[in-house]
């Protein structure tokens, strides 16, 4: 991983020393975390490059920009060309390659193939290449869009600026630093309408698309985007192989992908969550030798079983497992600390998961200062059916028969979310109706895309989110001088998955069965077949979001004030007095959905303010260093025992009698307050008058109304005709908060 940036005067005006080189230097400084090992500037006529290097391959010889011996081509590469040795062999002796750097093959591939230069490359990369002879600049990205590359083209067409991060773009004085509220609201309200381009969040700034090249003429200033790769479609009439052959080929490609991504002259590690994705990556990587693994240990990962599974996977492979303790109630994150994370991530959809990933990278770097590469399990869910439970609802197991209703649910979800932009239904409409948001800042309706069959709908639905995940993973790692690598996004794997016959989809793409079957020889069955769980979702989600609310409320709502200031400075929709009231009401009537909505709006406003304030962020105070603990020892501590109790009650038995805790009752609150959801007006209230949780679901409200301290959970659900999954999350949260209790346990406790 490195940082690349530069600009070109498309009107032909030459760059000057003492001016433009200073701008290039500032752009490099803005992304210095991406490349702390070396800095290089290049000025040629009307083109300027700046390169920040993180040395991973060919430590001594890999300096960039890379030039051909005759000086015709200069290139900068952020990322890795994993198969560079094979490419070198294919080039034969036609060129004099002088280093062992993987990036050196790029200019010579251009000499051979011009716009086809990336076709032989297997890697993750963002490239800027200057051809002095043809007076041409190319900006290109890898097939999956793992490595970032953004650009700004001035309205008059005279200036093009590009960079790996927004921070570097904003260091150029001609690049606008204006938050794009319109595109943000499209993304916020309609996150999975397809197809769409991933927005940068700022006006006049776009991404070079994945698998594409921006071809810039230095003669006439013309800019043209061409695509060099697309996810292939299965050919009509192609032979259909048995399911086992696709599983076998998938396993072979994944093993080779991990092997390639161990290409490094510096130490590397792996983030081991405990799920099958990262467990498979860890097992395959361990074939090459020992490596450290890092795991989040929290109330959530204990409750989900992830922390224990990660410990067992590492122990079974003989690898060190660093369980890093995150205490949501005592993390100590300040507004400055949250600002630092937003500044690093550069986007508003940032929440608890990014917070913990950010600090897990921080811990890994502190624990192993020489570590520069982390392997991740990212990208598997989006391509192998890992998000079915979010799409169809939670259940214990999935069967091929569930495939039929997947397409219907996906299409109806996309249509409904698109319609929200026209009418702003439910609680989003409340924010407009009660004056929290200015309706004029919210865009009109959009129509969802369509896809011919179920798998394309699923893939399009979730690959939109993958773009964000890749952005998050790149930024949270880069902030600490670390490169993240994603074996599941090897283009050969994507091509295989895209061409599996439709008649095999239900068998292979339900709950990642193709991966689970491929993992059978690598992992114990209990790990390979572990049910998908989400990082900070489910019943533990409310703890994480209440932590986020405490950050927003810190220093008398410092971040709230900054968000309002950012909105006012940039013509945003936040109405100051109403927004402060909304913030206060959410504190009185807390719920995950309300806090999440508040957090995203605050993130938008803070980013708008940071950009308008020259995009700087003071270092501020960070949380105390993350603490590593031994899993078994921590589980014997009071905090561990508490987490274990919560874990044991994750799925309360049908014969449990649930009742209200002493002093807790249901009350009706008149609908219409800013913090009151449009749907629900019922609240659980403690006797001291504190509204502990808003009831946003009629199903949950009906369940609570039937609690009498005598009937069992199963009896109440049967009476109402409900499934346990429909109330599992709020029930778990209420039991954790102590507003509901197991009546029998409460009686035994009182007797004791």
Regions found by a protein language model. Give the residues of each.
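ATP-dependent adenylate-handling ligase core
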Residues: 299-364, 368, 385, 389-400, ...
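Short beta-strand "wing" residues that participate in macromolecule-binding interfaces
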Residues: 278, 484, 529, 741-743
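Short, Lys/Arg-rich nucleic-acid/phosphate-binding segment
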Residues: 745-748
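Adenosyl-5′-phosphate
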Residues: 1-4, 8, 116, 170, ...
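Extended catalytic-interface subdomain
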Residues: 376-379
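Short amphipathic alpha-helical interaction segments
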Residues: 722-733
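A catalytic-pocket lid/entrance helix-loop region that shapes and gates access to the active site
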Residues: 382-423
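Cysteine-centered catalytic environments shared across enzyme families
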Residues: 1-329, 337-340, 344-345, 372, ...
